[in-house]
Amino acid sequence: MSMKGKETMSEQNERIVMGKLGSTYGIRGWLKVFSYTDNAESIFDYSPWYLKLKGEWVEYKVESWKRHGQGYVCKLAGLDVREDAQLMTNFEIAIDPASLPELSEDEFYWRELFGMQVFTTKGYNLGEVTDLLETGSNDVLVIKANLKDAFGQKERLIPYLEEQVIKKVDREARRIEVDWDPGF
């Protein structure tokens, strides 16, 4: 059981946000790119990109990209002048979930954990996964407790430590089993 592709992006309307467009670069429609992927350059492995315009995802092809200073810039097809590109500043870059690599049965993406119910090894329902935090030493599940939690908890932070705390992730049943004291 391993987590692959630790993307810390949100899934919205069947799209997965992988980064954001920054300010323009030059006069020919190039834009700075801020990638949320572990390896920043891998954002360019996904095509097409989707940008949200007036509440709707619109498909764009990356015509070209290059490294610039400490970051990256790209040229989107159809954006040929600075003024058009400026309208895209700060737009989120999303992809279709089908673009992600297939994983083996014991692997999953972080986004799949959102909404899963978390139970102790003794069967107590701790609540639902609402967020994941990267702390440096280990990742942490943020669990929203059930309304009538017997221990009076509203939220729990559970370290994502495979085998030690996380005993099983069942993607099909949308359930995570943990060795955790419900009082914490």
Swiss-Prot record:
InterPro entries: PRC-brl_dom (IPR027275), PRC_barrel-like_sf (IPR011033), RimM (IPR011961), RimM_N (IPR002676), RimM_N_sf (IPR036976), Transl_B-barrel_sf (IPR009000). Signal peptide: none annotated. It comes from the Bacteria. One of its GO terms (cellular component) is ribosome. GO terms for biological process: ribosomal small subunit biogenesis; rRNA processing. Keywords: Chaperone, Cytoplasm, Ribosome biogenesis, rRNA processing. One of its GO terms (molecular function) is ribosome binding. Residues 104-184 form the PRC barrel domain. Its main location: cytoplasm. Binds ribosomal protein uS19. The PRC barrel domain binds ribosomal protein uS19. An accessory protein needed during the final step in the assembly of 30S ribosomal subunit, possibly for assembly of the head region. Essential for efficient processing of 16S rRNA. May be needed both before and after RbfA during the maturation of 16S rRNA. It has affinity for free ribosomal 30S subunits but not for 70S ribosomes. Belongs to the RimM family. This is Ribosome maturation factor RimM.
